[in-house]
């Protein structure tokens, strides 16, 4: 095996984030651990835990390069990948690597990536080694790397931010409760810089939150720790976004850590919203960048209304003969007409031949011959029944009364 990269962490810096990781481990448990190698040019490699947030959200629990003690790259810059990823939950579901890595009992932790000599230039396996503070225990976790995934932190690098809105804990809690009530449907978010309000709409439900405008631009606002959490924002343009309600609720819950951070909503011109954890001054200097990207999500209400609209299947009015000119004459068939109602069987006299017919008896007439056969039979049946009733009249039964 050939070693491609080696990474050693500052375990004390990771242990400081144990409370933050425990707050988000429910979502991060089924995700991946990713090492961003593109960020080497921006200060060093970054370790991040990446997972999904609801229907259309992406969580990035990223550790700053300050938590990396040593980094060695045994490949050339052309051969090294942009990022390497592996599962957070080990096979067998017996060990969560992230929980062990951010634990307070770890004294040394390192990652080693390697590949087979006959393989390509990309690393194929990773080995996580941890030594505990009892000077005796030591653990090794080896697994295969996942297919290439782009770094989560670089998805918004080329996006233009047009506004930021900070939510105080009470406001974020009310918005989170409202978003949970909407289920997994779509939420239309409107940011109005003229009225200093943010409107959230889902079907007939609507929630309006106001904020205090700041005198700086979006890129200059909230650059440092938050000293006082209050509803404020720096917005330079009007924007309308559509996000998933469950993803919005999960993002607000993740970025609102008690006594550590408050959520900050970042609006981009492309319609994407990123909920970022703004660290409080009381939390100290934590090497953490926690964010949830909310992608565009078409609301179920709009999809349902589109699907429920009946299609206009009525034929269009066309000039006479238009349909006959579009296909050959022998293929045109008249429009089907409803079948005629059942008719009473009648007897008709045959057509008279040219030769003289025999004389008709005197007791029959043309009127009798043309009369329907069913009518004649019905009359005969009625007359015979009447004669039977006259011959045998119905006898009246007398009931016996013992009191007489």
From Swiss-Prot:
Residues with the Phosphothreonine modification = 344, 355
Domain of life, per UniProt, equals: Viruses
Query: Gene Ontology terms, cellular component aspect?
Result: host cell nucleus; viral tegument
Mind listing the UniProt keywords for this protein, alphabetically? Activator, Disulfide bond, DNA-binding, Early protein, G1/S host cell cycle checkpoint dysregulation by virus, Host nucleus, Host-virus interaction, Modulation of host cell cycle by virus, Phosphoprotein, Transcription, Transcription regulation, Virion, Virion tegument
Post-translationally, this protein is described as follows, namely: Phosphorylated by the viral BGLF4 kinase.
Sequence segments annotated as region (Homodimerization)? 1-300
Region annotation (Disordered) ranges: 302-404
MF-aspect GO terms: DNA binding
A biological process (GO) of this protein is:
symbiont-mediated perturbation of host cell cycle G1/S transition checkpoint
User: PTM Phosphoserine: at which residues?
Assistant: 337, 349
According to its UniProt entry, the function of this protein is described as: Acts as a DNA polymerase processivity factor; a transcriptional activator for several EBV promoters and inhibits the host DNA damage response (DDR) to double-stranded DNA breaks. Plays an essential role in the viral lytic DNA replication by acting as a polymerase accessory subunit. Stimulates the viral DNA polymerase activity and appears to function with it as a holoenzyme. Increases the processivity of the viral polymerase, probably by acting as a sliding clamp that prevents dissociation of the polymerase from the active template.
What is recorded about the protein's domains? The N-terminus is important for dimerization, DNA binding, and DNA polymerase processivity. The C-terminus mediates transcriptional activation.
Assembly and partners are described as: Homodimer. Two dimers can adopt a tetrameric ring-like structure. Forms a complex with the DNA-binding protein BALF2, the DNA polymerase subunit BALF5, and the alkaline exonuclease BGLF5. Interacts (via N-terminus) with BZLF1 (via bZIP domain); this interaction may inhibit BZLF1-induced transcription of the BMRF1 promoter. Interacts (via C-terminus) with host NuRD complex; this interaction is important for transcriptional activation of EBV promoters and inhibition of the ubiquitination step of DDR signaling.
Q: What is this protein called?
A: DNA polymerase processivity factor BMRF1
Q: Which organism is it from?
A: Epstein-Barr virus (strain GD1)
């Amino acid at each position: 095996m050939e070693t491609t990269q080696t990474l050693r962490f500052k375990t004390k810096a990771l242990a400081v984030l144990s409370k933050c990781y425990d707050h988000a481990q429910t979502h991060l448990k089924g995700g991946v651990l990713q090492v961003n190698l593109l960020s080497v040019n921006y200060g060093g490699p970054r370790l991040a835990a990446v997972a999904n947030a609801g229907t259309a959200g992406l969580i990035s629990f990223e550790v700053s390069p300050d938590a990396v003690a040593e980094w060695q790259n045994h490949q050339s810059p052309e051969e090294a990948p942009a990022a390497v990823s592996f599962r957070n939950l080990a096979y067998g579901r017996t060990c969560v690597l992230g929980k062990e890595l951010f634990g307070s009992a770890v004294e040394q932790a390192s990652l080693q990536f390697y590949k087979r000599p006959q393989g390509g230039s990309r690393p194929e396996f990773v080995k996580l080694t941890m030594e505990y503070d009892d000077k005796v225990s030591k653990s090794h976790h080896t697994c295969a790397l996942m297919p290439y995934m782009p770094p989560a932190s670089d998805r918004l690098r080329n996006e233009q931010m047009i506004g930021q809105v900070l939510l105080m804990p009470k406001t974020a809690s009310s918005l989170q409760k409202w978003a949970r009530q909407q289920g997994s449907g779509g939420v239309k978010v409107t940011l109005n810089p003229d009225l200093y309000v943010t409107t959230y709409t889902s079907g007939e439900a609507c929630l309006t939150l106001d904020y205090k405008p700041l005198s700086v631009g979006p890129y200059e606002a909230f650059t440092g720790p938050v000293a006082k959490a209050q509803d404020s924002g720096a917005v330079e343009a009007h924007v309308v976004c559509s996000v998933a309600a469950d993803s919005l609720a999960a993002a607000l819950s993740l970025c609102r850590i008690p006594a550590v951070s408050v959520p900050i909503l970042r609006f981009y011109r492309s319609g994407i919203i990123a909920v970022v954890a703004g660290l409080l001054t009381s939390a100290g200097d934590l090497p953490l960048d926690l964010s949830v990207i909310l992608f565009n999500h078409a609301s179920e209400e709009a999809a349902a209304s589109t699907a429920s609209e009946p299609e206009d299947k009525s034929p269009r009015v066309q000039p006479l003969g238009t349909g006959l000119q579009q296909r050959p004459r022998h293929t045109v068939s008249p429009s089907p007409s409803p079948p005629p109602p059942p008719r009473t069987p009648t007897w008709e006299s045959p057509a008279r031949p040219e030769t003289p017919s025999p004389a008709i008896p005197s007791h029959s007439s043309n009127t009798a011959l043309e009369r329907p056969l069913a009518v004649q039979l019905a009359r005969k049946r009625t007359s015979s029944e009447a004669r039977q009733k006259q011959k045998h009249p119905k006898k009246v039964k007398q009931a016996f009364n013992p009191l007489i």
